[in-house]
């Protein structure tokens, strides 16, 4: 039984609440503390019902604890009674979370009744011990050609999705959730950190329509929430994912949108606690906070957690402390380009900017590595030739360069792919392409086996066989 103690509110400054406890009854750091109307002394009156969860962050001395609220502090006043629960925040975990929208405290916000929880876990958990972690590096097949070929994702790794508004980050996220659910039997957890409420609602609606909602848990800490909630919602999502990994033995995918807002929330909390700011005004514990979350994303012998994190880059400055700290943890970066989306090529992934740690012959094999580098080499040469083409035209190019341009344009279109979750918009059925077929298809294009096919044959198809079939249809 947790050691429950009682304190009294002495100060309220926005999201920060100071509480004095009796000597010897101080809560541990990270303990959950509640302030509720129902726990007050007789005679207490309030305009509205108060039910606020806080987390102990600092021990100030003189038996006073400084706490950060995870919910709005409206209605809290000096002299109110606070209850130390004797444990960290606990949330429901298990398959009952699938198809539901939860907040940072694990409370349902979708008006669909209580969560049918398998268990309740604390959100503050240690990462797996080194002996439990899976040493081998494996590729997680996504069925998305450009990702599997150019920037393969590591099972249990961390992927950064970089891109502006409207270039297709959400569609890639939905397709990954769908492919993991249908092709691998896995579950996904979507964690909205500082997410716009409208975007979260749109995502839920689209996932319900596309039929993947039953394989996904949605955890939201919207941008109107106090900074404490936005700082901890990532841990709530991780805890839900860890249960599936450790108890169901599954390969779980967790999405964090946006990891920058996680750092931003830590910045706000740090300032509220009175800490001296560090570089560019960020909290001095930025690297520690980031590592605390990221180190829990890993493969074990039971299962894996793979994360895809949207990364906002302030003022396009990659040296800003928030994205710079995130880079240190990423295994793969998928860069979405507006220039490619303007060509109508989706997913609009830039194959020259996207990278992966496991694009290595010892991991993916020589054929995969050589094919990926060959694709990048041709696309890079095409990029260099575009200025010449724009000024002088194609006729001034050598025969070799003309061939490179022709193949590059085919490869560029071949990197496009119809998605299952976008069927209602494109009218084309989605296609899942295994990595082996992707590598073989691009290998044949590089070898010149399909130089006779038109560029249109390669647009929005799956493997090379579907491109050949499309070419025959176009000729007919």
UniProtKB/Swiss-Prot annotation:
| Biological role stated in the UniProt entry | Produces ATP from ADP in the presence of a proton gradient across the membrane. The catalytic sites are hosted primarily by the beta subunits.
Q: What is its main location?
A: membrane
Which InterPro entries would you find in this protein's record? Answer: AAA+_ATPase, ATP-synt_VA_C, ATP_synth_F1_bsu, ATPase_a/bsu_AS, ATPase_alpha/beta_chains, ATPase_F1/V1/A1_a/bsu_N, ATPase_F1/V1/A1_a/bsu_N_sf, ATPase_F1/V1/A1_a/bsu_nucl-bd
Q: What keywords does the record list, in alphabetical order? A: ATP synthesis, ATP-binding, Cell membrane, CF(1), Hydrogen ion transport, Ion transport, Membrane, Nucleotide-binding, Translocase, Transport
Gene3D superfamilies attached here? 2.40.10.170, Bovine Mitochondrial F1-atpase, Atp Synthase Beta Chain, Chain D, domain 3, P-loop containing nucleotide triphosphate hydrolases
Q: Does the keyword Iron apply?
A: no
Q: Tell me a Gene Ontology molecular-function term this record carries.
A: proton-transporting ATP synthase activity, rotational mechanism
Record-listed ATP binding positions? 163-170
The answer to whether keyword Membrane applies is: yes
Query: Superkingdom of the source?
Result: Bacteria
Which PANTHER family does this UniProt record tie to the protein?
ATP SYNTHASE, ATP SYNTHASE SUBUNIT BETA, MITOCHONDRIAL
Q: What is its EC number?
A: 7.1.2.2
The places in or outside the cell where this protein is found are: Cell membrane
Q: How is this protein named in the record?
A: ATP synthase subunit beta
SUPFAM superfamilies tied to this protein: C-terminal domain of alpha and beta subunits of F1 ATP synthase, N-terminal domain of alpha and beta subunits of F1 ATP synthase, P-loop containing nucleoside triphosphate hydrolases
Q: Which reaction does it catalyse?
A: ATP + H2O + 4 H(+)(in) = ADP + phosphate + 5 H(+)(out)
Give the way it sits in the membrane.
Answer: Peripheral membrane protein
Family to which this protein belongs: Belongs to the ATPase alpha/beta chains family.
């Amino acid at each position: 039984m947790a050691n429950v103690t009682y304190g009294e509110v002495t100060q309220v400054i926005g999201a920060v609440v100071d509480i004095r406890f009796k000597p010897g009854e101080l809560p541990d750091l990270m303990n959950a503390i509640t302030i509720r109307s129902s726990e007050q002394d007789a005679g207490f009156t309030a305009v509205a019902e108060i039910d606020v969860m806080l987390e102990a962050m600092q021990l100030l001395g003189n038996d006073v604890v400084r706490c950060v609220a995870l919910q709005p502090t409206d209605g809290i006043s000096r002299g109110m009674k606070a209850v130390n629960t004797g444990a960290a925040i606990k949330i429901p975990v298990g398959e009952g979370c699938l198809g539901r929208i939860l907040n940072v405290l694990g409370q349902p916000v979708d008006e669909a009744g209580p969560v049918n929880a398998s268990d309740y876990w604390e959100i503050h958990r240690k990462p797996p011990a080194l002996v439990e972690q899976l040493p081998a590096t494996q590729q997680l097949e996504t069925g998305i050609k450009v990702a599997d070929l150019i920037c393969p994702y590591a099972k249990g790794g961390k992927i950064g999705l970089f891109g502006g508004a409207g270039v297709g980050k959400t569609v890639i996220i939905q397709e990954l959730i769908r492919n993991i659910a249908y092709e691998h039997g896995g579950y996904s957890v979507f964690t909205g950190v500082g997410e716009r409420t409208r975007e979260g609602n749109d995502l839920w609606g689209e996932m319900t329509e596309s039929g993947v909602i039953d394989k996904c848990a949605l955890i939201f800490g919207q941008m109107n929430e106090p900074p404490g909630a936005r700082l901890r919602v990532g841990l709530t999502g991780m805890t839900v994912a860890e249960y599936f990994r450790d108890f169901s033995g599954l390969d779980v995918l967790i999405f964090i949108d946006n990891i920058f807002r996680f750092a931003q929330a830590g910045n706000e909390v740090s300032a509220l606690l009175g800490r001296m700011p560090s570089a560019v005004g960020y909290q001095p514990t930025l690297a520690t906070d980031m590592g605390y979350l990221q180190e829990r994303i890993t493969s074990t012998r039971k299962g894996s957690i793979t994360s895809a994190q949207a990364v906002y880059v302030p003022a396009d400055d990659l040296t800003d402390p928030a994205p710079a700290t995130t880079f240190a943890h990423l295994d793969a970066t998928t860069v979405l380009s507006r220039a490619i989306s303007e060509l109508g090529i989706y997913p609009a992934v830039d194959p020259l900017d996207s990278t992966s740690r496991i694009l290595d012959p010892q991991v993916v094999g020589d054929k995969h590595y050589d094919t990926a580098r060959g694709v990048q080499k041709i696309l890079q040469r095409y990029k260099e030739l575009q200025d010449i083409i724009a000024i002088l035209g194609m006729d001034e190019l050598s025969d070799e360069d003309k061939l490179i341009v022709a193949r590059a344009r085919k490869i560029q279109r071949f990197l496009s792919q119809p998605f299952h979750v976008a069927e209602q918009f494109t009218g084309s059925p989605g296609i899942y392409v295994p990595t082996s077929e992707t590598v073989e298809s691009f290998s044949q294009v590089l070898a010149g086996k399909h130089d006779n096919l038109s560029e249109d044959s390669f647009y929005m198809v799956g493997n090379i066989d579907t491109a050949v079939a499309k070419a025959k249809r176009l000729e007919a």
